[in-house]
Amino acid sequence: MGLTSEYPNLNIVLNDYCLWMEDSQFLNNLSYFYHLTIKLKKLLEKDFTCQKLEELYAKAKEESRYLSLTETLLITTEYIEERLPQYKTRFLKCLSDGTINIVADPEDIYEKNKNNEAGRDRKKHLYANVVLRHNTKDPVTLVHEFLHTINNEPDNRISRKYITEAISIYFESDMCEFLKRKGFTEKELMINDIFRHADLSGCVDDLMPIFPLLDSFRLLGPINSDSYDRMQQLSIEPLAMSKEEFYSKISNFEERLARVRKRNELLHITDGPKPQEPLVTFGYVIGTLIAYYGIENGTDDIHQRMIHLNNIVNKATFSDLLSYIDIDITNEKGLLKKIVPPLNKKIQKIKAYSSGEKNEPKEK
């Protein structure tokens, strides 16, 4: 059976990905990461449904502070001067030479199809699109995408792919802390917390079928209508979903991949953040958890290490990069002990906001 007989887009992507990741420590330990994902899913779905998070996001959007383009640029420049001074010249250059493309008010189909993203175009030129919302999310997004222009270099397999999100999300979170010090209230900044939490939940949900799919593809070949039954027969993974749910997600992936291909053709993107990479969402999951850990342990040492990750992201393995910030990805118990408390703190903060409790810091 060829790659294009059933679910053609998905099978081509799985094939390319397995070739790219051949013999890697990560690909050979899919089961470990799958079980970590299951535990995260149970933790995340305990308090909020997707619909509830959407409602909270809409509320937080209304309560966020309006920011003009000028205000966003001034705030972001001030943040970089204070927290990332070595990158100020580069930031200003990216703004002046168009590397950072700020879409203030999308007007045509070309602009309306743009997302907040960074990558390289067909000529291999760096770019970062930042679509303004004219609220307190804008400086956070601008910092996030700017960091991607710094670490968007030729791949070192998994190292850069899945660590760069940790770097960008850490500094977007650090920007939120900076905004608090500048007088922004917790309520005005909740839009960022809720967006990131909803994104984390969605990414974890997306990952659930991906790990079994990759194992199935490696061992059984292209995904088809028999894959689920064969996976169960061979006990490839203890599938945490019904057959109907499994194939529903596969169909959604196939449709999404087709849309992404069309969109990338429209925008002439060849090296952007490709959702067709099966585990692209893993970068957002591990990145968010590392960022929360870094902010919660907000010492200057951690901050400097996160900055230095940009310099070594193409020179070390995935596990070595995490070890640099005192995270052992191979020790499940130790890993959960470090990443779960900061995540729980975020969950409690959103729960307090949801119930109407005041989120302002209390006097000690």
Where are the language model's segments positioned?
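Short pre-active-site segment immediately N-terminal to the catalytic Zn-binding motif
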Residues: 124-142
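Contiguous, non-catalytic segments that form substrate-binding/exosite surfaces or channel walls
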Residues: 2-127, 346-354
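Inter-helical turn/loop segments and adjacent helix faces that build the functional surface
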Residues: 83, 153-159, 178-188, 218-226, ...
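Active-site-proximal binding-pocket segments
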Residues: 195-216
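Short, solvent-exposed segments of well-ordered alpha helices
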Residues: 133, 137, 159-162, 199, ...
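Post-HExxH zinc-binding segment in Zn-dependent metallohydrolases
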Residues: 155-202, 287
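C-terminal, non-catalytic "cap/extension" segments appended to globular domains
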Residues: 9-30, 35-50, 229-364
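Catalytic glutamate of the conserved HExxH
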Residues: 141, 145, 149, 153, ...
